[in-house]
Amino acid sequence: MTMPAGKYYLGDLCYCLHDVWDECCDLMFPPGTAVREVEGEFQLRDGRRFASFGTAYGDGEYRSSINTLHSVDSGSIGCILLSDIRDNQYSLEQLQELGAIVDFEAPFEVESDQGLLKFGPVLIETAPDYEDEELEA
């Protein structure tokens, strides 16, 4: 899936989409279906687009390849254009502390591959191989 170039919030979208969180949840967890979670790109009724992917281990903190720490309370990490954030519950500075503000100069691909979340060149590993880390210790 391709997202357009621009400045994005990259993190748990529950922090910046309070005003439409019920609609987001209905898109990601369609009511009346047995689907656990739908991942990928979504469009809100008002036309705003976002991408969201579930983390391998749910809530917690996950480090990115650009050395930002992403706090997660909804079990997912996504991206949305800063200009599409209308919820002011958190300031821009607070959102940066909870995730990252990334300026993508060109359209970028988003995907999830066995817990590795990819937002263009930014990677967030949500399923680290703890077994390998234990062997190295």
Residue positions per predicted region:
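Intrinsically disordered, low-complexity acidic regions enriched in Pro/Ser/Thr
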Residues: 1-137
